[in-house]
């Protein structure tokens, strides 16, 4: 009997050690109660994920019957991105405990809110970003660029939606998907249209011939859930694969929130699938190391400069920043055939995405190599870039 107790205790201890971890989060205000992102181990196959999801669905159903957890929706969505597997759902504590104890699960994380990284400053002010990224020296508004202008490249704007009928897109924009419940297939906020036109507008954009796909993952107030962002990423990868444009696609994330490991992994795997991903550093004037998507691997993280080539006072900084780009007082298209001026690292990121698209079109550079090439091409120095931060400024190597 004593031997049995010893063995039982050892097995129980081993089970506890092997249990998946529920990652803690420093900022509780962004957490969605009882909503989780569940990431599977690398060895788990697509079929095994499907089987696991069936088990979780049954487990949740039993929990509702026993404990009356009707207010929790259970399983929501599974993610399959370039061999990476995860799912989201709302579960009670007992169901969560069973999930954590499942040997297929790597870790679990709270789903959290995420927000745009830009804000409106004024309407119809003069633009300067295009001229700045096409000249080594400051002081000119002429935009000089390779004639390919992103031709053959597709830009996915994962944002508040895009006004695809805006004349600045010249008929090159199409609607992709809306993953936000209770919203229409349009851009009532303006942020998504502005960032997409900064990257690929005919007048206001850098990659003037690129195709544009609207992917609505944020609501009409510029806020969203990481679980929806991940769903949008999965759709983009699948869409690019179906259209055979992996290797010729750019995806922009002008959003920021607290660091979410599951989201970072989803973004990284989207990049590894064959998409150049430009992201915003965030607007908190702090180190972006603890921010997502800025801290994700295999992305090109952009911080924001002013017209004077200094760090914008709101811009985040830190070692994860790959480049600075224009981000204060940027004029671009807004819904209903309008234009407007916005500021933020949200505006810096599509500058990087747009120049990246032109580089891919003109030089045939693979998405995985684009950020390193942009760093090599960069000008500067940016003034007062922040601690442990590059002083390199985005430049398209126009020769000017």
UniProtKB/Swiss-Prot annotation:
The active site is at residues 159, 191, 346. Residues 20-117 form a propeptide. It is found in: Secreted. Residues 35-116 form the Inhibitor I9 domain. Keywords: Glycoprotein, Hydrolase, Protease, Secreted, Serine protease, Signal, Virulence, Zymogen. It comes from the Eukaryota. GO terms for cellular component: extracellular region. CDD domains: Peptidases_S8_PCSK9_ProteinaseK_like. Gene3D superfamilies: Peptidase S8 propeptide/proteinase inhibitor I9, Peptidase S8/S53 domain. Its EC number is 3.4.21.-. Glycans are attached at residues 138, 181, 252, 337, 388, 396. Residues 1-19 form the signal peptide. Residues 127-400 form the Peptidase S8 domain. Its main location: secreted. Secreted subtilisin-like serine protease with keratinolytic activity that contributes to pathogenicity. Belongs to the peptidase S8 family. This is Subtilisin-like protease 11. It comes from Trichophyton verrucosum (strain HKI 0517). The lineage of its organism: Eukaryota, Fungi, Dikarya, Ascomycota, Pezizomycotina.
């Amino acid at each position: 009997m004593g031997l049995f107790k010893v063995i039982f205790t050892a097995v129980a201890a081993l089970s506890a050690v092997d249990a998946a971890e529920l990652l803690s989060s420093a900022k509780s205000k962004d957490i969605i109660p009882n909503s989780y992102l569940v990431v599977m181990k690398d060895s788990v196959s697509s079929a095994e994920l499907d089987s696991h999801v069936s088990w979780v669905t049954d487990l949740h159903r039993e929990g509702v019957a026993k404990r009356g957890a009707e207010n929790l929706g259970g399983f929501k969505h599974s993610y399959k991105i370039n061999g990476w597997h995860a799912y989201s759902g709302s579960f009670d504590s007992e169901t969560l405990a069973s999930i954590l104890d499942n040997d297929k699960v790597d870790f679990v994380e709270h789903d959290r809110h995420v927000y745009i990284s830009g804000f409106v400053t004024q309407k119809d002010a003069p633009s300067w970003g295009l001229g700045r990224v096409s000249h080594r020296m400051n002081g000119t508004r002429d935009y000089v660029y390779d004639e390919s202008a992103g031709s053959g490249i597709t830009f996915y704007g994962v944002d508040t939606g895009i006004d695809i009928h805006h004349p600045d897109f010249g008929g090159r924009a199409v609607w992709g998907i809306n993953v936000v419940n209770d919203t229409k297939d349009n851009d009532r906020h303006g942020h998504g249209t502005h960032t997409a036109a900064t990257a690929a507008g005919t007048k206001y954009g850098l990659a003037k011939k690129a195709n544009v796909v609207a992917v609505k993952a944020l609501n009409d107030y510029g806020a969203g859930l990481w679980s929806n962002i991940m769903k949008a990423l999965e759709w983009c990868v699948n869409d690019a694969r179906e259209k055979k444009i992996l290797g010729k696609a750019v995806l922009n994330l002008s959003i920021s929130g607290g660091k979410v490991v599951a989201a970072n992994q989803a973004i990284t795997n989207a990049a590894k699938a064959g998409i150049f991903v430009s992201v915003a550093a965030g607007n908190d004037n702090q180190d972006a190391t603890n921010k997502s998507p800025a801290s994700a691997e295999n992305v090109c993280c952009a911080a924001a400069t002013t017209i004077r080539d200094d760090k914008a006072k709101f811009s985040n900084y830190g070692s994860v920043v790959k480049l600075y780009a224009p981000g204060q007082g940027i004029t671009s298209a807004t819904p209903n055939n309008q234009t407007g001026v916005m500021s933020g690292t949200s505006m810096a990121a599509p500058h990087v995405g747009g120049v990246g698209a032109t580089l891919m079109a003109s030089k045939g550079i693979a998405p995985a190599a684009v950020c390193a090439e942009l760093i090599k091409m960069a000008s500067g120095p940016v003034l007062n870039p922040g601690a442990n931060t590059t002083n390199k400024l985005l430049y398209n190597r126009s020769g000017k």
